[in-house]
Curated annotation (Swiss-Prot):
EC annotation from Swiss-Prot or TrEMBL: 3.1.1.20
Posttranslational modification: The protein is glycosylated to a carbohydrate content of 22.7%. The N-terminus of the 30 kDa subunit is blocked.
Residues of the signal peptide: 1-18
Site (Cleavage): 316-317
Disulfide bridge map: 25-71, 194-502, 261-278
InterPro entries on file: AB_hydrolase_fold (IPR029058), Tannase/feruloyl_esterase (IPR011118)
Catalytic site: 195 (acyl-ester intermediate), 455 (charge relay system), 501 (charge relay system)
Alphabetical keyword list: Calcium, Cleavage on pair of basic residues, Disulfide bond, Glycoprotein, Hydrolase, Metal-binding, Pyrrolidone carboxylic acid, Serine esterase, Signal
Function of the protein: Hydrolyzes ester bonds of tannic acid to produce gallic acid and glucose.
Family: Belongs to the tannase family.
Catalytic activity: digallate + H2O = 2 3,4,5-trihydroxybenzoate + H(+)
Protein name: Tannase
Naturally occurring in which organism (per UniProt): Aspergillus oryzae (strain ATCC 42149 / RIB 40) (Yellow koji mold)
MF terms in GO: feruloyl esterase activity; metal ion binding; tannase activity
Amino acid sequence: MRQHSRMAVAALAAGANAASFTDVCTVSNVKAALPANGTLLGISMLPSAVTANPLYNQSAGMGSTTTYDYCNVTVAYTHTGKGDKVVIKYAFPKPSDYENRFYVAGGGGFSLSSDATGGLAYGAVGGATDAGYDAFDNSYDEVVLYGNGTINWDATYMFAYQALGEMTRIGKYITKGFYGQSSDSKVYTYYEGCSDGGREGMSQVQRWGEEYDGAITGAPAFRFAQQQVHHVFSSEVEQTLDYYPPPCELKKIVNATIAACDPLDGRTDGVVSRTDLCKLNFNLTSIIGEPYYCAAGTSTSLGFGFSNGKRSNVKRQAEGSTTSYQPAQNGTVTARGVAVAQAIYDGLHNSKGERAYLSWQIASELSDAETEYNSDTGKWELNIPSTGGEYVTKFIQLLNLDNLSDLNNVTYDTLVDWMNTGMVRYMDSLQTTLPDLTPFQSSGGKLLHYHGESDPSIPAASSVHYWQAVRSVMYGDKTEEEALEALEDWYQFYLIPGAAHCGTNSLQPGPYPENNMEIMIDWVENGNKPSRLNATVSSGTYAGETQMLCQWPKRPLWRGNSSFDCVNDEKSIDSWTYEFPAFKVPVY
């Protein structure tokens, strides 16, 4: 955080608060606050597009019941000399509620956030951008191709990182003028998002680091090529092993694994807080022969690999979802079913045995492996998740198709080739893996990075790998102790025991952090650095319990049922560490 006097900031806020809501929420005031063309290099504002309307007693943010008065503003700009048009929505708190803050919310799937009101709860101006491709109504995957073989690179770069960075830079400038603040006044700027919203947050930290004071990034979908193709991996395992397990068999394998590994962390509470100990000590073959039963019903694929937990700030979270009938399933776990599960948890390797990517932690749901019932044949068949299939068709094959029709002639080597093609093609846009965060760190930025340990969509180890890359690149000349001490001053990473994708887990009643923004604001504005992360258990025997989670690389170990220690466990940490020799270039 750049150093500013708290007294000076308070004085600025007082000045802003002195203005009336009706005085500031006008088209003329917004136009006067716009940056003059040439002020922000490459940005030319379009004053004729400005709108400003006061709104009263409006709800704001996802799931909030609190109401606010705010100024609903629309502005537009063009990239100098290009002739395009980008529309931005801003929500300005009434002056008495403004607390010198700017807030950016992430989206999810292939959608940027379309809601500008998320910052109102924090006294912050918020924004949302259409990114120049009408992102309020279109998701990026709908516009990524102009036609077969032709990539829409403008939309790609805007979705990848550019649109949010420009929205933030423009928004902070307008904010100062809107409230009558001086041009050198401080506006604390925050980002918050999960899933692709987490990736978007990392893109801002990596490429627009000097614009932000604090970023909260959950389960980032970075390493985009590997992540998206990985959604096809489970189907390829089933095809390669020629076994398509009934969904109930996989559920039994997962639930039996949870039951077996639950006590390894020192407390039996239905939560596998130490998937590393599970990986090191539990053998899936011990489940062979156990009975399973599931009643007939329908199954809904939630799209983008989401499981049945709460999610935050996702515009089209059911994108790619399908519903299918499932008959009653009754049987025992087979050796072939266990082989499928084990191969998925082991991760993708090429035909030479070289590792290409990491996978989900053992005890995570095997959502991508869910097969589809064919009522004509009475058999379970391949069900390719559109999450990964669409990425292959549109981003790799450059065909305007929503999914792969089959995996004929596809091998593990094919998946590696797809990953490599995507990594190279989108290295400077979607991949989002730059490990040198010096501009963000040196300008005082704070990064709170978290990931559900049992995430069935984006592997938790993906976040661990990136944290390790940042440590290695930025502090490779320091001892491990020195590097950890330096990192925790500005970059803190937390695994959430038992948690699923961007939310709680219906299979494991574990804790989940609920006040990350309050923690971040206190860290940035008051200098109160956290050492552990506050999280609350919302269901099960321990519902209502508050847990202070361990900061990586320390791991939790319960002492009885009431408290746990954060311990160093090198063998366990090693189980989270990966190299990817299947690729010829470093994979951060």
